A protein has these predicted regions:
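N-terminal Rossmann-like dinucleotide-binding module
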Residues: 1-43
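Short beta->alpha connector loops
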Residues: 8-12, 68-70, 93, 119
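Short, Asp-centered acidic motifs that coordinate Mg2+ and/or phosphate
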Residues: 29, 61-62, 112
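Beta-loop-alpha module in the N-terminal Rossmann-like domain of NAD(P)-dependent dehydrogenases
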Residues: 46-105
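Rossmann-fold dehydrogenase core element
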Residues: 101-119
Length: 119
């Protein structure tokens, strides 16, 4: 499975990336608000682009969203509407209304929205 990651967050580099690799999957794309800054070398050979370009990439099977909390719902909705299942850091939403909106989009898209919880 090929993952796209929204942003170059520390939790993504330290927790998600090793877990994805250990499971035999790969991160192929990192989306950034400003892709010109590049990403941490730990990602290896990944494509770096804007969030929108990353979400439009048909080669990505799923998206991980470790962005700041206020961006969890809007960016997860954008990923779902792009046809990608989403793993989102907690909290998935900042209100019940946001969560209801996200759940409705996930149901319409027939894609999974999953919250990441570290063990």
């Amino acid at each position: 499975m090929k993952f796209g990651v929204l942003g170059d967050a520390k939790i993504a580099r330290e927790k998600l990336l090793p877990a994805i690799r250990a499971a035999g999957h790969e991160v192929t794309h990192v989306g950034r608000r400003d892709p010109s800054g590049g990403v941490d070398p730990v990602w290896g050979d990944v494509r770096v682009s804007t969030y929108e370009e990353m979400l439009a990439d048909p080669g990505i099977d799923a998206v991980y969203n470790p962005l700041p909390n206020h961006l969890h719902v809007p960016m997860s909705i954008a990923a779902l509407e792009a046809g990608k299942p989403v793993i989102c850091e907690k909290p998935v939403a900042l209100s019940v209304e946001e969560l209801d909106r996200l759940a409705a989009v996930a149901a319409r898209a027939e894609k999974m929205e999953q919250m990441a919880i570290a063990a």
